Amino acid sequence: SIKSFQQKYGSEVMPSEDKIDAEVYYNKHDIFTKLYWMYMLASVVMFIFVIIRIFKENRFLKTMVGICGVAVLILFGLHTLGLIWRWYISGHAPWSNAYESILYVGWATMFFGLAFGRKSSLTIASTAFVAGFILWGASMNWLNPAISNLQPVLDSYWLMIHVAVIVASYGPFTLGMILGLVSLLLILLTNDKNKKRMDLNIRELTIINEMALTVGLVMLTIGNFLGGQWANESWG
């Protein structure tokens, strides 16, 4: 049979039964296509409750914001699990092509949103929406989601270092972009009655925005230097 022939002459490159089962399960559940609308739904609901809470504080709104925050955290855990899953199946870091890079940018955006805005509901809601939008872009039919072999030029430990750092830097930059837009929205919604509370939220978002852009710039700079080292090592 074909399987026996493959095992006889190509056993060194054939995936194990566990990896085959893992890939079948991964393709069957299509986790990233489901994640994008879940991210967006959780973020929109959370954002609505957060905005209402700015104008009217009560226990119900606080509870709902907390529930939405936990939901976003669970979705991020599934996002992380999906990337680890692809890593296990392919045997290499899951940012080796356009599709995987977009998944990784979405993950990095959500990671930095949770890291910098863990006490800011507006930041978490805004970041979750952008992460969902990024995953939606990855689900479009112009990108091939297939798990393929690594291109020879990428078969290097620099894939783990350079690409991981420089692509992850897009995460805090994206976070800064959405926080800037949300800050402008809050400015438009500011009036005499809510000015004090709005100013606090805008100041909070501005501080987080500055931290995100600073981290993004540092990561992008380091990533460029690492890329130069990779090029020197590969081509001289």
Language-model-detected regions and their locations in the chain:
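Polytopic transmembrane helical bundles with strong interfacial aromatic enrichment
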Residues: S1-G236
